[in-house]
Amino acid sequence: MNIAFAQTKYSTTSEDFNNFHSTVSCAERMFKNDSLLQAFGKYGTAFENYNGSINPTHYFKATLCALKIREEFKALDYLEKAIKNGYEIDSNKTSLIVFNNQNTNNEYRQNINKWTAFRDSGRNTSWENEIDALQEEGKTHSTSTFKTAVESCVNCFKNKTCNKTTPDYVSKYKLVKEKMKADSITASKLLASTKQFGFPNMKLVNKKECAIARTILLNYDCDKKNERLDDLLFKALNEGYISPSFYAQVIDRRNVMNGLTPEFYEPITGYEKTIGKDLIIANNKRKTIGLYTIILPKATAKEKPVAGAKVGTTADTNLYDY
């Protein structure tokens, strides 16, 4: 279902999709809080009961959880799914992949290179190079000067009493408009190539290029009401290429850039002290796109704590990195 009132257009996801993300995000909260057995069970439930596409990041996190409780055969299964579906293990995480059982260790060593080769065989280097070139083109408008101007203007957009006629604001807003125009050109090029190559995802391009593409789409502020991007983003969301968190960030960025209130408060950073009574409303909206609920320390809204979550910790946020 499409939502397009006065604010930014977005679409709501299916019950099946929402149930999966509710369960898997609960697992990841538990994992972050060291409730490992409960997290392991939640991961299993999430994967077994969902028929849709799953981002390999979830399989990798489930791998780490399984390894910590010595469920090594299950960890091996999750790791194979993660890598074959495009996951790249960061160098700072390779030391976490340890199989103590001789059988699982042998199987891991015999297969890791095969899984990696399978993953790499599906990569489109031409698409990767094109995304890298787009990032290079946008460097002029990615300097601290432009970033500072955007941050300053966004803070002003959030404050209804902010004076938008001061020389400082006017000069910074000119930079914002210049950046928006440049970002629009970059986004248009990315969208044109997406029709040819497919949406940038971990099966097609590596993690770095996926992140670059997401940044380009997030910065496409000329698409003020998300009317040009929503069909593409919603399809990518359902295919597991982008997370509910990223989808919400796009919607909220468009709202804020237009002086409107966020729909989902994603990210919550900066709104902790002001969301108050709107927390329940925001969480109900978040559920419609499969996004985990916000849990704030000393929240004024009466929210039922999520099992396994220590209220107010960093484990309550930043559950997605894709």
Feature annotation, model-predicted:
Residues 1-6:
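Hydrophobic h-region of N-terminal signal peptides that target proteins for export
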Residues 191, 230, 234, 283-286:
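Non-transmembrane alpha-helical segments in soluble domains
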Residues 247-322:
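A cross-kingdom marker for long, charged
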